[in-house]
Design a protein with these regions (language model features):
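Conserved NTPase motor "head" modules and their coupling/switch loops across ABC/AAA+ ATPases, GTPases
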Residues: 6-151, 160-164, 168-171, 177, ...
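Walker B catalytic acidic pair
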Residues: 155-157
Length: 205
């Protein structure tokens, strides 16, 4: 808001240094913890994706942050100084564009399938498989840390999967509480063995 409104209220820029300092401090912590979580995803998700795709595809993950952060897994104080450097280098551009160009909101998780960027080259089925692999990997990490599975919500994930991949997902989510939504599938009772809720005209039965 400081940058956005600074043209009409130049005095707002007086608070920019203090705000940037606070943002860099919080951003450094966020980048640090994100990087360590993504490192764990990198250990869990590719194996799940390999099983999911029948060994035909290779999933890789990479955390991309601002250019001055040389190691996202470094200590927060190191990242803090590097974020401040990025802010200083881009201060003029930020004021001119009235947009914040430095910080964890600019980060991205790069997902690649067989060395190609998923967001540019993956099919809808490949994208769905990669997303499910990440979700299942995060679920396993949660279980490792807490000793129990989180409640898992899967919204209409089975309709676009072939029978083999449907079976893989259903076998992989055993344990814990799982909610799966779908439009129509007469095979669900046999596949799941759980309770079935029907929603019609806003009424659950």
């Amino acid at each position: 808001r400081i940058l956005r409104d600074s043209e009409e209220k130049p005095s707002l820029l007086d608070a920019l240094d203090e705000f940037s300092m606070s943002m860099a401090k919080a951003g450094a912590l966020l980048i640090h913890y994100r990087a360590h979580f993504i490192k764990r995803l990198c250990q869990a998700a590719p194996a799940i994706h390999g099983d999911f795709s029948g060994g035909r595809e290779r999933l890789t993950l990479r955390y991309e942050t601002v250019s001055t952060v040389t190691d996202p897994e470094a200590g927060p104080q190191v990242i803090f100084q590097q974020l401040l450097q990025h802010q200083e280098e881009h201060r003029a551009a930020e004021i001119a564009s009235r947009q914040c160009l430095s910080g964890p909101h600019k980060d991205d998780l790069l997902v690649e399938i067989d060395g190609q960027a998923a967001k540019s080259y993956a099919s809808q089925g490949q994208t769905r498989t990669a997303a499910l692999s990440l979700k299942l990997a995060a679920r396993e990490i949660f279980q490792q840390d807490t000793g129990e599975y989180p409640v898992l919500l899967l919204d209409d994930v089975l309709s676009e999967l072939d029978p083999r991949r449907q079976e893989f997902v259903l076998n992989r989510i055993r344990g814990g509480q799982v909610f799966i939504t779908c439009c129509e599938d007469d095979r669900l009772p046999q596949l799941l063995g759980g309770r079935i809720f029907h929603v019609k005209n806003g009424t659950v039965r």
